């Protein structure tokens, strides 16, 4: 299993801020193994716990799966009728077809 590691991210800054020197962020990963036991707290110490915590808690970036979306209506599902307007329309259509057959 992989042990703790340290990652440093260097970000360039404009010349006006901090004397034009790049800012480095240091991440300590104390999570051991593929399963991460990160704290659920969002305090400043826990949000800088590892790179994953920083992205999710500080920046709000979550690459995990979102909520499941429902699919579109399939052919087998019933469509609900509204009131009795549809029935009246069917009766009128059936009466028209009978009058056309008589002629």
UniProtKB/Swiss-Prot annotation:
Changing residue 52 to P: In strain: Isolate R-29-Nadin. Residues 67-81 have a biased composition (Basic residues). GO terms for biological process: positive regulation of viral transcription. One of its GO terms (molecular function) is RNA-binding transcription regulator activity. Residues 54-67 are annotated as: Core. It is found in: Host nucleus, Host nucleolus. InterPro entries: IV_Tat, Tat_dom_sf. Residues 63-103 are annotated as: Disordered. It holds the Pfam family Tat. Belongs to the lentiviruses Tat family. Nuclear transcriptional activator of viral gene expression, that is essential for viral transcription from the LTR promoter and replication. Acts as a sequence-specific molecular adapter, directing components of the cellular transcription machinery to the viral RNA to promote processive transcription elongation by the RNA polymerase II (RNA pol II) complex, thereby increasing the level of full-length transcripts. Tat binds to a hairpin structure at the 5'-end of all nascent viral mRNAs referred to as the transactivation responsive RNA element (TAR RNA) in a CCNT1-independent mode. The sequence shown is that of isolate R29-127. This is Protein Tat. The lineage of its organism: Viruses, Riboviria, Pararnavirae, Artverviricota, Revtraviricetes. The gene is tat.
């Amino acid at each position: 299993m992989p042990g703790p590691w340290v990652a440093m991210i260097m970000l360039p800054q404009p010349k006006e801020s901090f004397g034009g020197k790049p800012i480095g962020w240091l991440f300590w990963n104390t999570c051991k193994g593929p399963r991460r036991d990160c704290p659920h707290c969002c305090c400043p110490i826990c949000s800088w716990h590892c790179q994953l915590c920083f992205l999710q808690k500080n920046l709000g970036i979550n690459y995990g799966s979102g909520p499941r979306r429902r699919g579109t209506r399939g052919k087998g599902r019933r469509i609900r009728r509204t009131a009795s307007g549809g029935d009246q329309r069917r009766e009128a259509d059936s009466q028209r077809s009978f009058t056309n057959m008589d002629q």
